[in-house]
Amino acid sequence: MFKLFTARQHDKIWDFDGGIHPPEMKLQSSTVPMRIAPLPDQLIIPLQQHLGPEGELRVRAGEQVLKGQPLTVGRGRTVPVHAPTSGMITAIAPHTTAHPSGLAELCVHITPDGEDRWREQQPWADYRQRDKMALLDRIHQAGIAGLGGAGFPTASKLQGGLNGIITLIINAAECEPYITADDRLMQEHADEVITGIHILRHLLQPQQVLIGIEDNKPEAIAALQRALRGQDDIHLRVVPTKYPSGGAKQLTKILTGKEVPFGKHSSSIGVLMQNVGTVVAIKRAVIDDEPLIERVVTLTGDALSSPGNFWARIGTPVLYLLKLAGFKPQNPPMVIMGGPLMGFTLPSLDVPIVKISNCILAPAETEMGLSEPEQSCIRCGLCVDACPAGLLPQQLYWFSRGEEHEKARNHNLFDCIECGACAYVCPSNIPLVQYYRQEKAEIRALDQESARAAEAKARFEAKQARLAREKLARELRHKQAAVKLTDADQQTVDAAVSRLTRQSDGSESVINIPAGQMPDNSAVIAAREARKAQARARQAEKQQARSTEETTDVVDPRQAAVAAAIARVKAKKAVQAQHVTTDVAEAGSEAMAEDPRKAAVAAAIARVKAKKAAQAQHVTTDVAEAGSEAMAEDPRKAAVAAAIARVKAKKAAQAINPD
């Protein structure tokens, strides 16, 4: 009984919230055997066909290449691309690629030579004899990226799962309408699928391996069961048809019952998932040494007369494949890359097939229905019920329209798998997925700008820290240079130390002065006198400099003229006074010689005249000073004062010398 219960638990499947059941539309192509597309006239190989940076070119225009030859270098998360066939590289130039933006990307243009010659190949008959790192390098150099649509580098994904992987899940659900590439691949190449699973099992050593496939693929289920041949280490799980059961988180929940936390990947709970097409590419790379140069592409839609699945070389133009399937252009023309829910309308039909191109849908005019205009949200909540990721599409829509980036991020916008279930059920015809894609792109752009700003800030701070260190080092060197003694000072110090040493050990005798004698201090006295003389000379120079500064001050021309006039008057009065005094003295001497009384009278007269002359000179000086003050206040007053001074001086002179 316990074994029966354990077996039932082992085969149990779970369900996920949300999801929809759109028309499948798979019978158009799933019942038709795969065909091999012939080589086109030109192949266009974009350098970036995966999630990550493009590789560095290894070829140049005009070079001849062989089938499988690498065109770019593969390092880290850079996945190389290879020549799909042999031929000539005619150009390396931008070209429109399969992207909703319609932007041009750098591509290698190859003109096939028709020979389809391979480069030298080195198959590995027994991969078990190779170590894990050699296997990972082989997968990486083969240019394998996730063929389910994400395009994540497979080798990087496997390397991250070398430790701690409990469950390996092979995604064979292929849940989106119209697409049957994996279905036909399993029907026709089931043995290669199982061999690829064994390679992954050898690499990862998981506890269990599960294949998840929807119940609407009975032929593929039967083919896998035949290929397994009763193997009990790989379990085939058939799950109900429900969109989007092929999502990574949704299929993990269905097969294990575990939910991947928000913001995490399935590897965080010990689960690693690979697509069926990726598994076949791994088998061919490891065992056959064939890089990823072709894939299965579904061509379907009512605008095609012979839909089906084709093995198409990477770089084949879409229009070339459509013509192989009997394309009938519609009005208006519409060709979708991918499915009707997650795909996008191609901007041009000359875009090339890339590694993640699984379907080309060419619907008829009536097949997709008329596109109705977008209307306002009525808050019905149907989008919330349909969301398989457990998000709030209505809130994310408002945040996206209002450019509230942080709120959109906090409401787990990046957990949206863009399945289109919300837009499918919306009665207002709101293209919700388009809003979410645009909001994600804007947030990524802002994050990149913030990262660049943080990097610039870090560089600036590092520069400032370096400049501060250099400044401290310079200051330290300057301090060390300042305290370093010159050669002369060092010699003086050394001589003093030497004298002290000689005195201490008695090698140099002390000078003794006999009693009653004075020491010879003449040299000291002479040095002191010399210093005093130098001090006096410096003091005299300072005084002379101050006088020069005083005399060289800027003087007003009128004030200078007044001062010069006053100086002349003073000099004239002094001469006249001296002349008067001399005359009086001479007269007095003569009179004294003749008569003593007359001499006394003459002397008295001379004293009176001298006193008046002195008073007149004092008055002139006062007037001049007053004139100077007035001139400082007003030039006109100064001129008047000078005139008055001259008049007074003239009167004084007349009083002194009436003759």
UniProtKB/Swiss-Prot annotation:
Co-factor binding details: Binds 2 [4Fe-4S] clusters per subunit.
Organism classification: Bacteria, Pseudomonadati, Pseudomonadota, Gammaproteobacteria, Enterobacterales
Cofactor(s) required for function per UniProt: [4Fe-4S] cluster
The protein's name: Ion-translocating oxidoreductase complex subunit C
Record-level GO cellular component terms: plasma membrane
Alphabetized PANTHER family for the sequence: ION-TRANSLOCATING OXIDOREDUCTASE COMPLEX SUBUNIT C (PTHR43034:SF2)
Entry's EC annotation: 7.-.-.-
Domain of life: Bacteria
Residues that bind [4Fe-4S] cluster 1: C377, C380, C383, C426
Chain ranges of the 4Fe-4S ferredoxin-type domain: 366-397, 407-436
Residues that bind [4Fe-4S] cluster 2: C387, C416, C419, C422
Organism this protein belongs to: Yersinia pestis bv. Antiqua (strain Nepal516)
Example GO molecular function: electron transfer activity
Assigned keywords, A-Z: 4Fe-4S, Cell inner membrane, Cell membrane, Electron transport, Iron, Iron-sulfur, Membrane, Metal-binding, Repeat, Translocase, Transport
Entries under InterPro entries matching the protein: 4Fe4S_Fe-S-bd, 4Fe4S_Fe_S_CS, Ion_transpt_RnfC/RsxC, Nuo51_FMN-bd, Nuo51_FMN-bd_sf, RnfC_N, Soluble_ligand-bd
Tagged with keyword Transmembrane: no
Signal sequence interval, chain numbering: none
Gene3D superfamilies documented for this protein: 3.30.70.20, NADH-ubiquinone oxidoreductase 51kDa subunit
Disulfide bonds: none
Subunit structure: The complex is composed of six subunits: RnfA, RnfB, RnfC, RnfD, RnfE and RnfG.
Family, as annotated: Belongs to the 4Fe4S bacterial-type ferredoxin family. RnfC subfamily.
Protein's job: Part of a membrane-bound complex that couples electron transfer with translocation of ions across the membrane.
Subcellular location: Cell inner membrane
Statement: the UniProt record of this protein carries the keyword Lyase: no
Record-level GO BP terms: electron transport chain
